[in-house]
UniProtKB/Swiss-Prot annotation:
Residues 1-88 are annotated as: Ubiquitin-like. The modification Asymmetric dimethylarginine is found at R519. The gene is Fbxo7. Residues 1-20, 85-149, 494-523 are annotated as: Disordered. InterPro entries: F-box-like_dom_sf, F-box_dom, Fbxo7, PI31_Prot_N, Ubiquitin-like_domsf. It comes from Mus musculus (Mouse). Keywords: Cytoplasm, Methylation, Mitochondrion, Nucleus, Ubl conjugation pathway. A motif (RFDP motif) lies at residues 482-485. This is F-box only protein 7. Pathway: Protein modification; protein ubiquitination. The modification Omega-N-methylarginine is found at R432, R452.
Amino acid sequence: MKLRVRLQKRTQPLEVPESEPTLGQLRAHLSQVLLPTLGFSSDTRFAITLNNKDALTGDEETLASYGIVSGDLICLVLEDDMPAPNLPSSTDTEHSSLQDNDQPSLAATPSQTNIPDEQGTDSSQGQATPFDAWTDDSMEGPSQNVEAESIQDAMSMEEVSGFHPLEPMLCNETEDGQVPHSLETLYQSAGCSNISDALIVLVHLLMLESGYIPQGTETKAVTMPEKWKSSGVYKLQYTHPLCEGGFAVLTCVPLGNLIIINATIKVNGGIKNVKSVQLQPGSYVAAGVEPGESAAKVYKDLKKLSRLFKDQLVYPLLAFTRQVLNLPDVFGLVVLPLELKLRIFRLLDVHSVLALSAVCHDLLIASNDPLLWRCLYLRDFRDGTVRGPDTDWKELYRKKHIQRKEAQRMRHAMFLPSAHPIPFCPIPVYPRAYLPTSLLPPGIIGGEYDERPILPSVGDPVTSLIPRPGELPGQFRPLRPRFDPVDPLPGPHSLLPGRAIPNNRFPFRPGRGRSADSRLPFL
């Protein structure tokens, strides 16, 4: 195996004579051969890394287990230059590989980027998410279908305090004692009777995470395909959206304490062998576990198995299938493995996820994955309710979002200021004591005035306090009818023609249109 070794900005070729070298053999070869040629002592202590940061540990492990192939670049870091030793992480499989021409690669492995933890991305919870796809006229109005109890639950859910850690969504994100929800559901529905069955269930889930679609089942990650095991032999058949016209078949045969997984493809009626992997069930499945036990107690080292199985079988199988079908090279977000798409979509808000789903059919399928919507639901709503395996997480998210918006609308209405009160009237208007009102004209005996002679004016209490011209200012006007039947306009300034007005030069001058009354001197 030929490798390239970089130390302090200097790169040297190195040839390891062993066919399947381990990390310890590589370390010894570097100390005896490479370090003296670079001017260092063979006793110099160093760390082997792939990214100049994370040291590889486990001298008994083979280089292939870390994804190192011929032509790869490895970096040496002297211990004097390292501030603190780093534990192996999910970035251990990062490598900038120069793969041989006889082994084409489709895309980088999902472990090449260490996505930061999204547990602190819950800041969008206090904001109203303005995605129009769920508030258009095509959707049902929230005020018509949301019950009061659900609204109260949504309001109380927002007031829950505390930290709610997210569960792992993929197998390469798990730690000891953790399994993805999809693996728990799949394991409980499979009815495993031995550790070989449990390992095949895990292999099936890894194929699903890589974007393969199983044949023989309509659901994606709830149940195992039909006739997946027969007479001690396991057989799984898949298709892939990027390999139309080709079928991938996994034949798993238990041999002693090993399981041999042979990958073949069916293209144009022919069958071609692609790859073969040997797995030891005892390394990833705990022995002596009773049926019905939690999957977290059954499986172990899921991160390691996910890296090995995908790097050594899944992605080479996908690349070889495209090569056999003579398909051109593809690039971009659409052709990324499904697990990388899910990890990208998980970092987005729901409005952006729905916008991406409207771009093309492939992104629509990826954005409708139930694993993604379960993760988004737990991130945005922090609901700890245990739900069944057939839960529609996208529909549940939509209902909870509508309830939250309705609860926010109700909470906003509760704190709105009340309408302005009616101004205080200093002079009350008394209701009429006798109903109906007298039918007599105003001013006639027995009319409105005689019913309440104490009040200055019942009809207009405000203007009654304003003295008219020629009257003395006071609290009340003189007690008299509002309208005089003889002189309808009482007061000293009558404007009717023929009336006597003080300071008039012609007090008895007839008005226009009528003669003077000749009977006035005799009266």
